[in-house]
Amino acid sequence: MQRQTDRHLGHYVVPAGRLNWLIPVLPIILSLGGSELQQTGSPVSVMLLSHNEVLPPDADGVILGEVTAKPLTLDDWFKYQKGQPLAVEITGRVEEGSNTSKPDSPAIGSRISRTLQLDPAIRNESICLVDGGWLPLIYCLGGTNIFVDRNIVAEIKARFVGGKLKSGGTAERDFLNMLEQKACGSTLNPLPYALEGNVQNLPDVDVVLDQLRIALADLAHALPHIRVWPKSLYDREQTQATLGSYHAYFNQGMDFLQRVGPSLMATTGKAKRRAAWARIIQAAKDTGISPQHICVAITLSALTASQQFNPAKNVLKPAAVYGAAQAYNAMWDLFLLFLLRQFQSQHSEYRSALLTRDKNLAFLWMGMTIQRTVTEAGEKQQVVFDERLMKCDPDEVEFLQALLGASNIGYERPRA
């Protein structure tokens, strides 16, 4: 059995976790209705094993550890929603204990890749946002630091008790039900729950500690077998340091959104687009906010994306009267993406993810990439948009680059 170690992350400690997969050699279609899966017309058996479990003597398969999955894209989401099977490429290390009768089986210690095909009948109401896109929760059950907010904790509390699905609950197949698996090696991190305020700003230290206490108790009651982080309350000094590191960024975003919120209501035609962009950048300068702040990029997307698909506008919810309450709600959603990206870029070894039920927030994440680059002037942030979130012609791209700096914003066309 592998000894569990503690890893330091900022002021806090995150426990390590690992999940082994027993998989057949060929591609499969994954089903949560039971242990049977469909593979070109013939059933196969797939199991999730914790790192100290052994392969059953009658099982024939390859055990994979250190499993990672290639993130899915916005295009993949649309295919999945249309009922099309979805292929996910996973890579893992062949572990001791693998048992297969096939003569060409991979060697112990080798790394192999396999493609698993998801059954579109499985619901994915809680979307796991990962570095580079999204994944169904099943691919984040081993060693992932999963941020959970108030809505997710409430859903877990309503669905589980004592590590089991509640009797009389929904019988539908949903990836969230996979949290019932005793082999789950990930960590649920309720930091977003603790930091969410209810007074149109980030909460004070006492509120953070109270909310963290509630979240930890609810998770322990619902899923006692799953690791949580932290295991106990932060001390006041640690909590104050965390709040202090986020307050300025959050407040700047709120001030900026209150200034520009009403101007985002109307559809901006192509002829008026450049003037609207220029006003947004001028508002950023007037409020003293960095053009690299996530709010600036998202407001530009809200002005530019089509009204048929505009997740930025749906998250910001512009209105004629856009006060502190509206700005807080929008900034909180964007702050979750900022928090996730900060952990991913500064502590990539913890494979941080955000579990959310907000599809518009998820679409934003799927349709943009927040990259950190190092230049002679220091570290900076670059936002790369999918074309559907910010469709521009070459001249408009040059105009934006003149406003923001050539390295601060870009876009990519959807894959064919």
Task: Give the residues covered by each predicted segment.
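Active-site-proximal, substrate-binding regions of enzyme catalytic domains
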Residues: 21-351, 365-371, 376-416
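Catalytic cores of DNA base-excision repair glycosylases
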Residues: 3, 18-20
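Low-complexity, intrinsically disordered or signal/transmembrane-proximal segments
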Residues: 2-4, 8-12
